[in-house]
Amino acid sequence: MEIINQTIALMDETAAVKALSALAQAQRLRAFRALVAAGSDGLTPGVISEQLGVTPSALSFHLKELSHSGLVNAEARGRNLIYRASFDHMTALLGYLTAHCCQGQACEASSLAQCLDC
């Protein structure tokens, strides 16, 4: 429980708004979901562009927005960039939303493991 509380503490209102704003656009949400599905292997921009049917220049803009929000990390691997979802940031955002969703009263949050279609 302490680890969860520490993760939630990493998220404040400003960071939550930034992350939610980044996800409040269809192409960025699709790109983020593709990166979540890819897991720790991540994806190159070319693969994401092909999967989503988005031009490379448009995707570059969207990945930059996701990176600035903290939801996505990029790593140079040779001549390629590998993008990965930041699961720590995503968990902190979900924890922040859950912790503040019931106006200070206990609320029942279902397990994330139950969200198989996400």
Where are these regions (language model features)?
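Amphipathic alpha-helical dimerization/coiled-coil segments
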Residues: 1-15, 36, 87-118
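N-terminal helix-turn-helix DNA-binding core of bacterial DNA-binding proteins
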Residues: 10, 14-55, 77-89
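Alpha-helical residues within the helix-turn-helix
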Residues: 50, 67-68
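Short, hydrophobic-biased segments on the C-terminal half of alpha helices
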Residues: 63-64
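Conserved catalytic-core motifs of GNAT/GCN5-like acyltransferases
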Residues: 75-76, 107
